[in-house]
């Protein structure tokens, strides 16, 4: 189970960290964003917010790809914005 600070992560804080990962490729930031994405997608699942969960799974894939230096650049950032809108209120 994730640390309480990860579980309490707000969607806005996650978005900022994930965007930083996607734009700057800093491994530590990417790892934290990935942990936050996991916590958020589990929260979405627990609330039966399956469209949001699906969007977050896509963001997780983008974060992993970024860690592997195979990121999708601007498309990944655009998908993060879509996920943030699709998960409003999570």
Language-model-detected regions and their locations in the chain:
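Mid-chain, structured segments of secreted extracytoplasmic proteins
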Residues: 45-89
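Immediate post-signal-peptide N-terminus of mature secreted/exported proteins
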Residues: 2-35, 39
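Residue-level detector of intrinsically disordered, flexible termini
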Residues: 1-2, 75
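Surface-exposed polar/charged interaction patches
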Residues: 21-24, 40-47, 90
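General helical secondary-structure elements
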Residues: 13-15, 43, 68
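Short cysteine/histidine-rich zinc-coordinating motifs and their immediately flanking basic loops
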Residues: 33-34, 41-43, 64-65
């Amino acid at each position: 189970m994730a640390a309480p600070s990860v579980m309490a992560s707000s969607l806005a804080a996650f978005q900022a960290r994930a965007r930083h990962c996607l734009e700057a490729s800093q491994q530590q930031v990417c790892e934290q964003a990935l942990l936050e994405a996991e916590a958020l997608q589990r929260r979405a699942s627990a609330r039966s917010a399956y469209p949001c969960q699906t969007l977050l799974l896509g963001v997780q894939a983008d974060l992993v790809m970024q860690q592997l230096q195979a990121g999708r650049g601007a498309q990944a950032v655009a998908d993060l914005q879509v996920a943030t809108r699709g998960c409003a209120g999570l």
